Amino acid sequence: YHSQTALSFNSMPHHGWLLAVAALFLLHDGQASMYQGYKLIRFDANETVAEWLETMSDVAHDYDEKRGEERRILFDVFSEPSKIQSHADVLVAPDFLEAFLLMLRKQGVEKVIVLKKDMQKLIDEEEYTIDNRRRRRKRAGNVVDDFDDETYHEYAVMTRFMQDLALHHPTLVKVVNVSRSTENRQIIGVKISTSSIYKPAIVIDAGVHAREWVAPAVAMYIMKKLVKSAGHDHRLSKALIDFDWFIIPQVNPDGYEYSRNTDRLWRKTRSRFNGSRYCLGTDANRNWGFQWGKAGANRSPCSNIYQGAHPFSEPEIEGLKNFLTFEIPDLTIYLSLHSYGQVWLAPWGYTGKRPDNFGDQQEAAHKAVGAIRKTSGANYTYGTIAEVMYPASGTSIDYLQDKGVPYIYGVELRPQDSTDSYGFNIPAKFIKPTGEEMLEGILAISEHALLKKKIRL
């Protein structure tokens, strides 16, 4: 494909790149949910190219004038260049590929490799595997084991399982109401605790970005494991005695259901109040009210990292903020699960400066990634968001750091960012090993917190 790419660069007249830009605004037939022929490409991207990609994201969409909404994407940045990788991974529509390659050439990019030749095939394989497993699975006879924690579920199944857990384990599990989404879905989670007395809290949330399916699946896996192991596994039982565990597996249910039913690669919420005729949704992890709208966020409603009309414009994030503020007196450990790349990220994101408790946070992170490596052999990189990845403002991580929560991490789960990576479409067979290693990492941090903070119950 390298030679074909070179031909694409060189065969177009010099003025052709102007026509390529014009192609951004052409309307096409076809469903927004279909990615047939879309290619995932990789290329080295310096700071100039990275900035160009961000500005181009404003016009990376194709619009339907009659329906007044986005019809499909022309390209989508899956993975940005960061401090630990110099490349970008970008998904490109088949009839926009030549134009995009030409624009890359104008930015000085000469070499492009193809990671996935047809994204729709990966999506179809994923859907087939999920449906096939659902048909074959037999009921186990009890509420805990009946929930299949090695597949991807619709949101209604997840909520029903949480409610059933509370019904069948009333002394251990309680359903907590967090918020309502733009489309009026109830966002719930569970509190898992051995006592009605408030204890230091561990909060795990997931599903902030709709297409990152493995994150809510891992949160559900951890939830099931904790309940099933209570009173049987000594280490997990102790963790339940020492801490209140709050697990909110799906913060963005509207986006998640849209990614399941319409557009598998949708990232944002589904809010409409952003001033755009066409583009819906906000990046829920750019919408928090600390250093909002600074580096690593975007003011364009069509951008995948759109910050929202104002801080906490999204009811999902406003509700989560209020829940963390008013319902949890002693929030000690907070983890937000994402994918992908296998990175364990601490504050700050908005600046390269380090927080006052940087040393303690990094010591805990070191123990967490060490526990993961010992458990599964998986390698996770750790550091601050700005130092390891790239600037990002308006995140939950920075907001809670500003509020004084001691241990705060955003975790990019499996897979690694490699040339043969599944990306957002990681097969469900990886849920269990990812859940096991994450639980070990969280336990390592909880034990560190008990030691360092000298928590007394």
Map each language-model feature to its residues.
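M14 metallocarboxypeptidase catalytic domain recognition
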Residues: 13-457
